[in-house]
Amino acid sequence: YEDNDKMMKMIFHHIDKSLEHDENDYEVRRISSAISLMQKKYEESEEHGKIAYSMNPNDPRVLAVYGEILVRNKKIDQGLELLHKALELDPIPAGQKTSDNRYRDLVLGYFCKKDYDVCITQAQKIKELEPRSWIFLLFSLNEKNNEINLKENEYFVNKYDNYSKLDWKETIKGFHLPDEEMNKNLENFTNQVIN
C-alpha cells in the first residue's frame, strides 16, 4: 500500500463499524485483539481476546491470539495452555506449510516464563528461525550453559549472516515484550554476542 497510515485508519474504521454492528462477532474481536497487540495496547488486546475466547473457545486462531496476549500480560501458564491447545487442534494453520508459527508462539511463552529448557526444545522444532525465535534460542542456550561458545553453535552460525546486520535495539522493540527488564537483557545480550 502506498500510504500505510491511511490504510490503518481505514482498517480501524471498518473494525469499529463491525463492532457497532455486532459486538459479539468473535472474528472481529479476534482481529481487534491482534491489532491492539500491534499497537501495544495490551489490556485492550486481552479484553478483545477474552471476549472472542468466551464465544469460540475451540477456534485455534482465537486460542493463538488470546494465548499470546496472556503470555505478554504475564498470565504465562494460562497463555501457554491455550497456545498448546492451538497447536494440538491446528498444527499447521491455514495458509501455512509448517507448524513454525505455532512453535514460535510457544518459544515466546517459554522464554517469558524463563523456562529455557522448554524454550530451546520448542525453538529446535522451527524449520525457519526468524529473528525473534533465533535470539530467544541463543539467549536460552546461553542461560542454560554459560560455558557454551555460542559463536560456534550451529544455530548461531546458520543465521548469523542473515541477522547480524539488524538494528537489534529496534528489532527487540518490535517483539512487543511488555517487560522492560527482559528487553534490556536482550539488548545487552545482542550487544555482547552479535555486535
Could you describe each region identified by the protein language model?
Residues 3-7, 41, 75, 149:
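Residue-level preference for long, well-ordered alpha-helices that form the structural scaffold
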Residues 4-22, 46-52:
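Amphipathic alpha-helices of TPR/Sel1-like and other helical repeat/solenoid scaffolds
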